[in-house]
């Protein structure tokens, strides 16, 4: 029996989640909700993507539906999640990808509208967070609302897990060099909470805050309080990179650290954590479905207990793939 899902918010993540879900035989997307996008425009936005390219199948709209490769997907335009008729549409699982309803209270409205469970595609202040490959096995069926954490946490956590399991992490600092996102400005404009964030995205390197490193402590409790970090927003459209600098409990050579990561990438974290020794740059990872790809040639070691590790991630496509993976895990655990 197919997992029936609805997507709330047809932005960058919502549209990519739909692309990925359409490739999975066990998932059926039956509805999309976005108050700002009519069906005809939704078809256009889904078909053409400046970053990931044109959708290779057939995309049209008919009345109040999106039609993709002959499959009809209902399009709603409700602002209040509680007003979306998920139940009537036959939706069991909602992907909450607006970036607005990130608390259990906000996500609960989807359940009030007839859905059974909700996966939030952003960090949440109170919903339990899961990172596939790290702690998804701790999911229990009684949890109706969960968070897939952030794209950066999904990159950092698998890497941190391997290092902590093998060598122990005393403490660490993370910097993510992060591509432009939709909340940034095309030209200088008002941004009252974050003044720097109001500056032109395409012409600046912009320091910003991120809770991604601290969030690792929520998915790996042993690292709680041991990691923090910051972000540098840079003028690239997609693909970001994590710089993790840690003090180890156990002495190691850079080769030993690399071997541990390589072993994990071929073992328990296969398909989640990648490994490369090639002379790569950011665009080489466009469309990558890994959460994190360790760049063996880019890291450095100062002493046997002090090391800098570099890992790439497609912050759109890799993350959206994990959203769908978590959905499948939740559905399987719930049946």
Curated annotation (Swiss-Prot):
Site (described: Activates thiol group during catalysis): 178
Catalytic activity reported: D-glyceraldehyde 3-phosphate + phosphate + NAD(+) = (2R)-3-phospho-glyceroyl phosphate + NADH + H(+)
Active site positions, chain numbering: 151
GO cellular component, as recorded: cytosol
GO term, biological process aspect, one: glucose metabolic process
Molecular function in Gene Ontology: glyceraldehyde-3-phosphate dehydrogenase (NAD+) (phosphorylating) activity; NAD binding; NADP binding
Top EC class, one word: oxidoreductase
Binding residues annotated for NAD(+), in chain numbering: 12-13, 34, 79, 315
Gene3D superfamilies assigned to the protein according to its UniProt record, in alphabetical order: Dihydrodipicolinate Reductase, domain 2 (3.30.360.10), NAD(P)-binding Rossmann-like Domain (3.40.50.720)
Signal peptide (from-to): none
CDD domains to which the protein is assigned, alphabetical: GAPDH_I_C, GAPDH_I_N
Keywords linked to the UniProt accession: Cytoplasm, Glycolysis, NAD, Oxidoreductase
Subcellular location: Cytoplasm
Binding site for D-glyceraldehyde 3-phosphate: 150-152, 181, 210-211, 233
Positions in coiled-coil regions: none
Known EC number: 1.2.1.12
Any Pfam family the entry gives: Gp_dh_N
UniProt pathway annotation: Carbohydrate degradation; glycolysis; pyruvate from D-glyceraldehyde 3-phosphate: step 1/5
SUPFAM superfamilies referenced in this protein's UniProt entry, alphabetically: Glyceraldehyde-3-phosphate dehydrogenase-like, C-terminal domain, NAD(P)-binding Rossmann-fold domains
Domain of life per record: Eukaryota
Subunit structure: Homotetramer.
Protein name: Glyceraldehyde-3-phosphate dehydrogenase
Species of origin: Debaryomyces hansenii (strain ATCC 36239 / CBS 767 / BCRC 21394 / JCM 1990 / NBRC 0083 / IGC 2968) (Yeast)
Source species taxonomy: Eukaryota, Fungi, Dikarya, Ascomycota, Saccharomycotina
